[in-house]
Regions:
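Surface-exposed repetitive/solenoidal architectures
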Residues: 7, 12-214
C-alpha cells in the first residue's frame, strides 16, 4: 500500500496502486514522464493514470485546460507525486489544470508547487466546475490577486474536495484566499479535508475556504 503523505500527515484513504496491465484493462492512458503529463492537453477528455513520480523541475509548464477548452477527463495519481510545478503568469486560470469541468482528480500529490497567477489560481486547478478532487494533497506556495487556493482557486456548481490535505501557503494580494479553495460556491462541498499552511490576503481569508458562498 502506498499512502499519500504530506510532511506531517498521512491521508486516511490508502491507495493500492494499479499495475500497468490493470490500468490498461480499465481503459487508462499511462503517464510516466513530464512529456506524457503535458500531452494530456491533446485529449482533454481522456482517462489518465500515473505510473511513476514526475518531477517538473526546469519544465516550462503549459496549463492544461482553459475557459474555452476545459479538462473534462480523469487523472488518477495512483499514489504518486507531481513535484516542483512552477508557473509564473499574469493570467487567470493557473495551476496544474487551468479549468476543469466534470473532471475527476484522485490519489494524487502535488508537491512543492510554486504557482503565481492573477485570478483563479490553485495548486491543482485554477477553476473547478462540477469536478471532484479525492484523496489528494498539496504543498508549496500559491499566490495571485484573488480567488487563490491550495487546491482550487474557484470551486463551483457541485464541485467537491474530499479526504484531502493541503500544506500549501496561500497568498492573495486582495481577496478570497483559502487553504484548500479560494471561493467555494454553488452547492460545492469540502468534506473530511484539512489544511495546515499559512493564508494571507486583505479580505475573505479562511483556513479551508476564503469564501464559502453555499
Amino acid at each position: 500500500l502506498r499512502c499519500l503523505v504530506g510532511s506531517e500527515m498521512c491521508i486516511r484513504d490508502r491507495v493500492e496502486p494499479l499495475t500497468n496491465e490493470e490500468a490498461l484493462a480499465e481503459g487508462y492512458t499511462i503517464i510516466k514522464s513530464a512529456s506524457d503529463l503535458q500531452a494530456i492537453q491533446n485529449d482533454l477528455d481522456g482517462k489518465y493514470i500515473l505510473m511513476d513520480n514526475i518531477d517538473l523541475s526546469g519544465v516550462s509548464w503549459n496549463v492544461i485546460g482553459s475557459l474555452n477548452n476545459a479538462f473534462t477527463g480523469e487523472l488518477n495519481g495512483n499514489g504518486y507525486a507531481i513535484s516542483n510545478l512552477y508557473i509564473n503568469s499574469g493570467d487567470d486560470y493557473q495551476g496544474l489544470f487551468g479549468y476543469m469541468e466534470g473532471a475527476k482528480i484522485s490519489n494524487l500529490a502535488v508537491d512543492g508547487a510554486n504557482v503565481v497567477g492573477r485570478r483563479y489560481v490553485g495548486g491543482v486547478a485554477g477553476y473547478s466546475y462540477d469536478s471532484e478532487i479525492y484523496n489528494c494533497y498539496s504543498t508549496g506556495v500559491i499566490s495571485g490577486y484573488s480567488d487563490i487556493g491550495g487546491f482550487i482557486g474557484y470551486s463551483t456548481h457541485y464541485s467537491s474536495i474530499a479526504s484531502s490535505y493541503s500544506k500549501a501557503d496561500v497568498v492573495a494580494q486582495e481577496y478570497r484566499a483559502g487553504g484548500l479553495v479560494g471561493c467555494n460556491t454553488d452547492n460545492s462541498t469540502i468534506t473530511d479535508s484539512l489544511s495546515h499552511g499559512d493564508v494571507e490576503g486583505n479580505l475573505n481569508i479562511g483556513g479551508l475556504a476564503g469564501e464559502n458562498a453555499g
